[in-house]
């Protein structure tokens, strides 16, 4: 949690970055197009471009034969219009000559089939050849451009993902295991519960990565493999940046994180909490499916806010929106265009939650291949007059007036704990409901009340300092180590308020269950223990009575055994009717609540409202508004920057309690104003 309002600049720029992925290597035979790009950059009010992301074959068309002249001109031309460059390393897609000459760089899938050259992100992270080749090209880039005044940041590779199961990776995995378990095979067998199905190993060489044609049922193995994949990816990244850190130590480094699935949950395949420690700046690629047919615009905006707050909290500093689309993408099931006004609103939401940039994929639509219809600033018409280009220019004009916002953050008294390892483990668990676990979505459900009331939230990982917060919410923390339990206990003992839910605290860091049903320290904190969890069919319902109101329950209901806890709510139906569903417990100087079932949104609003009142949790700036309007604040020592955003399809009245000034128009506002559909107003308030 921030306690002061010092600015943290992600780069040496003191302005909002606006631009995106620029692929001039696709147009080297069209100098007229490249000349048009520079003209259009000025017209679109863009200032920063990520260059070279997939340009390896243009930089090194044959092994040891380099062509940097085109990149020299591109960077010089961008700088000539006072633009800046985020220079990428090209490891995300290697040239064909390399795959042909060095087949060891090709990835092997879990079925042990070696992939052909093609696509992207299909390399072996362990391959010494690929690591050497990557360092070579990166060194040349750093030597040539490290002192160029346009260079703002390094963009290392692109959207790291995937895994390899080749012989080299098997050897690396076994070495990783030997280090983790101190070369003690018995310790590994114990951690993986080896006697199950006679899966005790007698030699390290017998261990293979999970495979549909081999082992997939040993959950300790699966969990350690995912940890290894994260560590090996980070190792590859660290190898990439050796020459860059050596030659350009003052240029910040990032790589672009992602979201997952159409529901925009945190990317699941890599533990970003580990990866974040190796980056100077967090950046991520955001592609919400605006105007979809399964949720309201406000509900989607809330989910965007959650993942923004997670990625911002990874380093407790502003992040960068590295990729977004000016309108439609090309890979959603339905690629709907952003409606007029939505692009500005969506972009300003990212800034409101902590981004110091609005960057796009892509600057110009490619003419061929799979991304030729992906949204871009410049369409195939090469025009500055179409709707999308004009909306991009409006975003740029707005960002030009937000330089004072750059580097600011905001404090939070509320934290929600998100854990990648627990997500892996619960998804692997053969129990509960296979389709209804929905761990990330459950955290968003608990986030809702605070987002609706404009109360800042940090979405933190288990390594963070819990004592910085008044309220810590820990939904569905299936996997929890004794170390984390001890820190939760210390948090409550020190005066904190802890909320935990069903399917929490069931296994340790090896995915082994705690004997006795629940860890003794958890029983002490909560004054009760869970006895069994009832998993409901999709059409099943139960109800919980809380404060004389009935709330619908779906999916899960946990039967609880009281010790010293108080009953705050009870089940109304089934064999556990009239038994505790919600408990509270005073523990030393703090308090702990346990929610036994998955309850409707209105329950969370009412339950958390009591805690909001009790703990004096408040918005940074009070603005009166209805549901569907979000107010987010970024704070400097002398001013608050207030983003008031209408995520509804109707006009919405809002009211300020004190005088504010519109940052874009300079208008002074004292009292009420009306937001149009999808409108955003950005105001400042002097402290």
Regions found by a protein language model. Give the residues of each.
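Short, acidic/polar
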Residues: 27-42, 136, 264-275, 339-347
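N-terminal carbohydrate-binding accessory modules
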Residues: 1-48, 61, 76, 84, ...
């Amino acid at each position: 949690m921030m306690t002061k309002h010092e600015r943290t600049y992600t780069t040496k720029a003191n302005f909002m970055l606006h631009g995106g992925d620029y692929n001039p290597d696709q147009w080297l035979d069209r100098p007229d197009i490249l000349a048009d790009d520079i003209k259009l950059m000025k017209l679109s009010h863009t200032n920063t471009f990520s260059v070279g992301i997939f340009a390896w074959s243009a930089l090194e068309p044959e092994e040891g034969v380099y062509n940097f002249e085109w990149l020299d001109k591109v960077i010089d031309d961008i700088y000539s219009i006072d633009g800046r460059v985020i220079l990428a390393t090209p490891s995300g897609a290697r040239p064909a000559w390399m795959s042909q000459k060095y087949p060891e760089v090709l990835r092997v899938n879990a079925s042990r089939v070696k992939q052909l050259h093609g696509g992207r992100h299909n390399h072996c992270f362990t391959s010494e050849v690929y690591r050497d080749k990557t360092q070579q090209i990166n060194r040349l880039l750093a030597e040539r451009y490290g002192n160029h005044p346009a260079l703002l940041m390094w963009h290392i590779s692109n959207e790291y993902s995937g895994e390899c199961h080749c012989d080299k990776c098997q050897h690396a995995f076994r070495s990783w295991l030997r280090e983790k378990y101190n070369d003690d095979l018995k310790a590994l067998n114990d951690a993986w519960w080896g006697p199950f199905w006679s899966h005790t190993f007698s030699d390290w060489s017998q261990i293979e990565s999970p495979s549909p044609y081999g082992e997939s049922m040993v959950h300790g193995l699966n969990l350690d493999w995912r940890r290894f994949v994260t560590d090996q990816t980070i190792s590859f990244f660290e190898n990439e940046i050796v020459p860059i850190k050596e030659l350009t130590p003052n240029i910040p480094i990032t790589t672009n994180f992602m979201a997952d699935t159409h529901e925009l949950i945190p990317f699941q395949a890599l533990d970003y909490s580990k990866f974040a420690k190796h980056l100077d700046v967090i950046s991520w690629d955001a592609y919400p499916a605006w105007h979809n047919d399964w949720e309201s615009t406000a509900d989607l905006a809330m989910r965007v806010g959650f993942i923004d707050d997670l990625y911002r909290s990874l380093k407790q500093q502003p992040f960068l929106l590295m990729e977004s689309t000016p309108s439609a993408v090309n890979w959603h099931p339905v690629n709907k265009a952003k409606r007029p006004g939505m692009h500005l609103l969506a972009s300003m939401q990212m800034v409101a939650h902590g981004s110091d940039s609005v960057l796009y994929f892509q600057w110009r639509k490619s003419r061929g291949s799979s991304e030729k219809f992906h949204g871009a600033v410049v369409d195939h018409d090469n025009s500055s007059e179409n709707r999308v280009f004009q909306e991009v220019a409006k975003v740029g004009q707005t960002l030009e007036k937000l330089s004072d916002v750059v580097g600011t953050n905001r404090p939070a008294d509320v934290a929600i704990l998100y854990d990648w390892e627990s997500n892996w483990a619960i998804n692997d668990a053969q129990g509960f409901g296979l389709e209804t676990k929905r761990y990330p979505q459950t955290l968003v459900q608990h986030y809702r009340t605070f987002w609706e009331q404009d109360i800042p939230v940090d979405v933190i990982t288990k390594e963070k300092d819990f004592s910085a917060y008044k309220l810590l919410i820990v939904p569905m923390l299936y996997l929890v180590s004794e170390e984390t339990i001890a820190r939760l206990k210390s948090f409550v003992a020190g005066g904190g308020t802890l909320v935990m839910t069903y399917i929490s605290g069931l296994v340790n860091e090896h995915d082994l269950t705690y004997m006795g049903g629940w860890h003794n320290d958890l029983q002490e904190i909560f004054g009760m223990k869970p006895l069994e969890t009832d998993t409901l069919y999709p059409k099943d319902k139960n109800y919980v009575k809380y404060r004389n109101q009935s709330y619908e329950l779906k999916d899960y209901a946990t039967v609880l055994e009281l010790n010293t806890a108080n009953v705050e709510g009870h089940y109304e139906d089934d064999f556990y009717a009239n038994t505790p569903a919600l408990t509270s417990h005073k523990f030393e100087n703090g308090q702990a609540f346990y929610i036994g079932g998955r309850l409707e949104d209105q329950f969370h609003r009412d339950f958390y409202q009591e805690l909001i009142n009790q703990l004096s949790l408040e918005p940074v700036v009070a603005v009166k508004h209805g549901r569907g309007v979000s107010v987010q604040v970024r704070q400097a020592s002398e001013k608050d920057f207030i983003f008031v955003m209408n995520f509804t399809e109707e006009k919405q009245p809002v009211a300020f309690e004190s005088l504010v000034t519109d940052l874009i128009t300079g208008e002074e506002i004292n009292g009420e104003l009306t937001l149009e559909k999808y409108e955003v107003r950005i105001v400042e308030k002097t402290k």
